[in-house]
Amino acid sequence: MNKVPLLEMRNITKSFGKFQALKGVDLTVFSGEIHALMGENGAGKSTLMKILAGAYTTTSGEILIEGRPWSIKGPKDALNAGISLIYQEMQLAPNLTVAENIFLGSELSRGGLVQRKEMVMQTQAVIDRLGAQFKASDLVMGLTIAEQQQVEIARALHRNSRILVMDEPTAALSTRETHRLFELILRLRDEGMAIIYISHRMAEVYELSDRVSVLRDGQYVGSLMRANLNANELVRMMVGRPLSDLFNKERDIPLGHLRLKVHHLTDGAKVQAVSLQVRSGEIVGLAGLVGAGRSELAQLIFGVRKATGGTIEIDGVPLVIHSPREAIRHGIGFLTENRKEQGLFLELAAQDNITMATLERDACYGLLDRKKARAISDDAINRLNIRVPHAQVRAGGLSGGNQQKLLISRWVAISPRILILDEPTRGVDVGAKSEIYRIMSQMAREGVAILMISSELPEVVGMSDRVYVMHEGRIAGELHHPDITQENIMTLATGVTEDHKKEVYHD
């Protein structure tokens, strides 16, 4: 690293009225460095970066570029300093071409005429440098999210940016797209660019970052070099308590009777003769690689997918579940893995989202009982500690953690016998994860049978009483404590023990 930092933010404070969002924050970034910025939602990460990008002005503090004070009062000042910020929500015009987006606001012209051919040529040169597959003449609306992200990066390169800020860039990307993005980020770093990478995903931070800085409650907590990265220390820095305290699972919860019994359930495609059981008060983990059939199994149980064979029993009673409505009537709740596309009604109020699954139950002659709906939503908001100013706030405006708790509260409201959670903490920060784990443990204590699908192995190990592992549509094995380890789960998930897999169905 160079001795003189490319960027220094010193003693940055920012107040919104009486609320102080940042309290004397420091941040130092060098050329050729990937600098991760971590912290819970509300820690001040986005506010700090918006100050750097000129979207906000500081209340006090100073910014230095290569050791020289630099006044950033607006976006133009940031661009002149070589700073570009890629927001989580893309800042592109979908009806314009890639080239038109790259040059938007700075179009090439000669004699009053826009030089479109030259703009396309220059844009294509940047696209080729990135190794992207789209063309400069393509409309942005026809590109994937990953490609739109590349357009944002291309725009930063076109502007000769030296500092690139990326806010949760993998939130909407597939595993393959994420891998390609990482390759590009590493290449840009090797070319000398400084990259500030905002993320709550530790796996990404471990893979990419040269250094990590942590904010908590609007204050700078500290930084760790790559060689010193430690999950326990990062969690402690972010939430003020060690990783061992993150999981709230109580091992001494007495298990009740057999609540859910699945026998040889099949859909003829993704799920092949799966058998599993969950008892009242038990949290059972369902692990496996992407494409193993875990989500499809959950959809079969909830009636989203049609089963071609096998049986489902609840409390010893055989059932045929044709639809989610029937599943809800039988006391099954299902938290989907994609809350924005498959779970939440983003434009509706928090109250409407909470009571969505109880409308039929609580309606009187087809009319909504608004007083009862308000009571249900208020109780859920208090019980799950959902941070909203009031029950009528729009769901789409909430943080990821509060959106997830909002969805969980929908199923808490039906007083479920069985709760299926598909990636319950995906896209939420460490603090929200801890609260979700607390909610899960509380529901288990109340006798709910919980089937938890998760790709986060520490979560599976920390929260599960037992674990089933799927491989290529089948159960590859079942693990009990103390054999529930990440190594054993991955061995089963990758099919290494396929010839010696354990018998997991109990007659």
Swiss-Prot record:
Reactions mediated catalytically: D-ribose(out) + ATP + H2O = D-ribose(in) + ADP + phosphate + H(+)
The answer to whether keyword GTP-binding applies is no
GO annotation, cellular component aspect: plasma membrane
Subcellular localization, as worded in the UniProt entry: Cell inner membrane
- Classify the protein's membrane topology as the record does: Peripheral membrane protein
One matching Pfam family, short form?
ABC_tran
Q: What is its EC number?
A: 7.5.2.7
Q: Which residues form the ABC transporter domain?
A: 7-242, 253-497
User: What SMART domains would the database entry show?
Assistant: AAA
Q: Molecular function terms in GO for this entry?
A: ABC-type D-ribose transporter activity; ATP binding; ATP hydrolysis activity
Sorted alphabetically, the keyword list is:
ATP-binding, Cell inner membrane, Cell membrane, Membrane, Nucleotide-binding, Repeat, Sugar transport, Translocase, Transport
Where on the tree of life does the source sit, at the highest rank? Bacteria
For the ligand (ATP), the binding residues are: G39, E40, N41, G42, A43, G44, K45, S46
Q: Is Cell inner membrane one of the keywords?
A: yes
Q: What class of enzyme is it?
A: translocase
Subunit structure, briefly? The complex is composed of an ATP-binding protein (RbsA), two transmembrane proteins (RbsC) and a solute-binding protein (RbsB).
Give the record's family classification. Belongs to the ABC transporter superfamily. Ribose importer (TC 3.A.1.2.1) family.
Q: What does this protein do?
A: Part of the ABC transporter complex RbsABC involved in ribose import. Responsible for energy coupling to the transport system.
Q: What is this protein called?
A: Ribose import ATP-binding protein RbsA
Can you name the source organism?
Yersinia pestis
